[in-house]
A protein has these predicted regions:
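The feature captures the beta-strand-to-loop junction immediately N-terminal to the Walker
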Residues: 43-45
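Conserved ABC transporter NBD signature motif
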Residues: 66-76, 84
Length: 225
């Protein structure tokens, strides 16, 4: 693994919402680079721009200024972000934004099927991912009947089933009990994936990441561990 390979780079990134009456940018000339194998944490208050940054990375929003480079290429147009979405898995902050099929198996298998896997291959991936997350036997459970914590883990399963190169996790420990947070921590630490986690939980970030930045007033500040 070549840890010197920069796979995500934000250069002078700025973003302001059109309905922001204060006209203060949510992100202001922000610079960050993440190399392959790095585990990066992002902490900040509500409204500080963590989710906005993730949505910019995935092409769900467009920056007011600056550049986004992913896998060595600048990404500007919708077609530029198609490869990004295939190789980077985003866990949304709200699980209901991620889960839309009647059953757990259908939700988890949706991504692999969309990538061209057969029904049998998608089902095998679904079972493997659910087992890894300690969710054996959840295949036929109705998604809308799951608890908040269970929905969170199923959302993560849908991301992992896509076999991404990079994980972008927006508040992954929210709604999870202590035992489940511990299991999630073990899963992340044992993974060889590059990932970026936004969380209010500084203890969780200290256990799952190697570098932590604070986002505030549109700027990033690296925290000393």
């Amino acid at each position: 693994m070549d840890n010197s390979e920069v796979i995500i780079r934000f250069k002078g990134l700025s973003f302001t919402y059109h309905d922001n009456q204060s006209h203060r940018p949510v992100l202001d000339d922000l610079n960050l680079q993440i190399s392959r194998g790095e585990r990066v944490g992002l902490i900040g208050d509500n409204g500080s721009g963590k989710t906005t940054l993730f949505h910019l990375l995935m092409g769900l929003l467009r920056p007011t200024a600056g550049a986004i480079e992913v896998f060595g290429e600048e990404r500007q147009k919708e077609k530029d972000f198609r490869e990004v979405r295939e190789k980077i898995g985003l866990l949304f902050q709200d699980s209901d934004d991620q889960l839309f099929c009647p059953t757990v198996a259908e939700d988890v298998a949706f991504g692999p099927l969309n990538l061209g896997k057969s029904q049998d291959e998608a089902l095998a991936i679904t079972r493997e991912v659910l087992e890894r997350l300690g969710l054996e036997g959840f295949e036929d459970r109705l998604t809308y009947k799951l608890s908040g914590g269970e929905k969170r883990l199923i959302s993560l399963a849908t991301v992992l089933a896509m076999k991404p190169e990079v994980l972008i996790l927006d508040e992954p420990s929210t709604g999870l009990d202590e035992d489940t947070v511990e299991r999630l921590t073990e899963i992340l630490r044992s993974s060889d994936l590059t990932y970026l986690i936004a969380s209010h939980n500084s203890d969780f970030l200290s256990k799952t990441t190697d570098i932590v930045y604070r986002l505030g007033r549109g700027k990033l500040t690296r925290l000393v561990s």
